[in-house]
């Protein structure tokens, strides 16, 4: 017997990453994103999914670049904290004692404490 289900999310992407954005220190922000993945390998393209009502959305839309920062076990608290607190109310780099570093290609900062930073 066939079942029809309402549209929804059946597959939950993992792991969560910290996405850093902003083109200058006054707008730097970190958002925790679970919806991240590969679109294509040639040319290389990846995606993140961010709701329009999130604080980072207009920053991402304005600058059209960001960094996907992979996390580690030691960054679990910061990853969670950055996901439940808004950049409107907090300076996340400062409060989590994370270091914004200079990216090679984009203006958005990398997170120095992360082992792998993918500039997009």
Residue ranges of model-derived segments:
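Active-site-proximal mixed secondary-structure blocks
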Residues: 1-32, 37-119
């Amino acid at each position: 017997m066939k079942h029809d289900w309402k549209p929804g999310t059946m597959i939950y992407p993992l792991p969560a990453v910290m996405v850093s954005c902003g083109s200058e220190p006054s707008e730097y922000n970190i958002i925790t994103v679970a919806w991240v993945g590969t679109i294509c390998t040639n040319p290389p393209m990846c995606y993140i999914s961010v709701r329009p009502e999130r604080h980072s959305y207009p920053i991402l839309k304005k600058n059209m670049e960001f960094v996907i920062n992979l996390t580690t076990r030691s960054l679990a608290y910061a990853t969670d904290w950055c996901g439940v607190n808004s950049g409107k109310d907090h300076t996340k780099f400062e409060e989590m004692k994370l270091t914004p570093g200079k990216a090679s290609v984009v203006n958005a900062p990398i997170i120095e404490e992360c082992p792998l930073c993918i500039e997009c």
